[in-house]
Amino acid sequence: MAKETRFYPYTSNGGATLGVSGPDFAILAGDTRSTAGYNINTRYEPKVFTIQDARDRSIVISVIGFAADGRALKERLDAIVAMYKYQHGKNIGLRACAQRVSTMLYEKRFFPYQLQTMVAGIDADGQGAIYYYDPAGCIEKRSHCAAGEASSLMLPFLDSQAPRLQPLSLQTAQQLVRDAYTGATERHIEVGDHLQMLVVTREGVSEQLVDLKKD
């Protein structure tokens, strides 16, 4: 009997992303390992990116799932943000950017980006905020969230720890992120190599790169 062959353009490139927000900061983090099944494509494939670096209006995005879709979404958003600044003479705000990403994903709902997406930054009130999206563009504001291969492990960890440590300080949040990824690398082969953290405060965006398990 002949085997039917169907076109399926999507694949998952592994990894995990995580977001934590506090009174005056937001963190998006992702590991840098890219996989295809049991193969490692590369040990440095960023999943978190800065959209703009303007003072007091810094925005970061994380994309995980199909890496090519992630790059396409990020590059398209870069162009939209640049056009907004050209037309209005100012940087786009976090809430407007978050809504625009939702629209971009919804526009592709019949052939969607195979991604779990987060957008984070400092809102107009000076508070840290994280917006989480499904592939069809449904948007939800959260204090913390996780996506990707190890999300089922990391999210319960955050759910149990973050409320107990309120009000959450930046240093405590960074340690929670490191602990979550340290545990994830012990149990998920798709996660590892390096932890990339983008920390957004009123002063702008800072990046940290921490070594993770490499085997």
Swiss-Prot record:
Q: What is its EC number?
A: 3.4.25.1
Q: Which domain of life is it from?
A: Eukaryota
The Gene Ontology CC terms held by the record are: cytosol; nucleus; proteasome core complex, beta-subunit complex
What GO biological process terms are annotated to this protein in UniProt?
Answer: proteasome-mediated ubiquitin-dependent protein catabolic process; secondary metabolic process
Transmembrane residue ranges:
none
Instruction: Tell whether Signal is among the UniProt keywords.
Output: no
Task: Family membership, please give it.
Answer: Belongs to the peptidase T1B family.
Role, per record: Proteasome subunit beta type-6; part of the inp gene cluster that mediates the biosynthesis of fellutamide B, a mycotoxin that acts as a proteasome inhibitor. In the first step of fellutabmide B biosynthesis inpC activates 3-hydroxydodecanoic acid to generate 3-hydroxydodecanoyl-AMP that is then loaded onto the T0 domain of inpB. The 3-hydroxydodecanoyl-S-phosphopantetheinyl-T0 is sequentially extended with L-Asn and L-Gln by the two CAT modules of inpB. The linear lipodipeptide from inpB is then transferred onto inpA for the addition of the third amino acid, L-Leu.
Q: What is this protein called?
A: Proteasome subunit beta inpE
Species the sequence originates in: Emericella nidulans (strain FGSC A4 / ATCC 38163 / CBS 112.46 / NRRL 194 / M139)
Whichever gene encodes this chain, its name is inpE
